[in-house]
Design a protein with these regions (language model features):
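N-terminal FAD cofactor-binding segment of flavoenzymes
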Residues: 42-85
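Extreme N-terminal starter segment of soluble prokaryotic enzymes
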Residues: 1-3
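Hydrophobic/small residue at the entry helix of a nucleotide-binding pocket
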Residues: 11, 15
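Acidic-histidine catalytic/liganding microenvironments
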Residues: 22, 63, 122
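Conserved N-terminal helical subregion
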Residues: 74-154
């Protein structure tokens, strides 16, 4: 049995690394990604920034990912939540909860490059990039994926 992940953006790359870590490379993972992460036109790793909750950062640390991106993160100390047109709002301060940060902000391009470096050394992970899916065949017992280059993954 193996796992085939199509799409190596933030979610797919993180899933592949998590499976590798949690199974110690014993469950083979094929990650298929159409665009190299260093490409300026990568749709998942562009110049956008995302906010990660502190709990997410802690989970990423548990599976060995956060350590690779932490030096490029910016801590979130304050969160202001309001609803336009309504009187209510709330402001959360990390110091009120005696924590360093409520979360972290990271730029997707930096994260993508670092995730793909981790993927290259992740036990049990085979990276197919750049590669595209040509067809998927299903049976009661299995699924196989044929890539445009002729490689068949099952």
């Amino acid at each position: 049995m193996s796992v085939i992940i199509v799409g190596g953006g933030m979610t797919g790359a993180t899933l592949a690394l998590a499976i590798s870590h949690l199974t110690q490379g014993q469950l083979p993972v094929h990650l298929v990604e159409a665009v190299a992460p260093e490409a300026s036109n990568h749709p998942g790793f562009d110049a956008r920034a995302i906010a990660l909750a502190q709990g997410t950062c802690q989970q990423l640390a548990r599976i060995g990912i956060w350590q690779a991106i932490a030096d490029r993160a910016t801590a979130i100390g304050t969160v202001h939540v309001s609803d336009r047109g309504h009187a209510g709002f709330v402001t959360l301060e990390a110091q009120d909860y005696r924590i360093d940060a409520l979360g972290q902000v990271v730029e997707l391009h930096d994260v993508g490059l670092r995730l793909f470096r981790l993927l290259q050394d992740a036990p049990g992970v085979t990276l197919h990039c750049p590669a595209r899916v040509a067809s998927v065949s299903r049976s009661e017992a299995s699924v196989s994926v044929k890539l445009e280059n002729g490689t068949v993954l099952d």
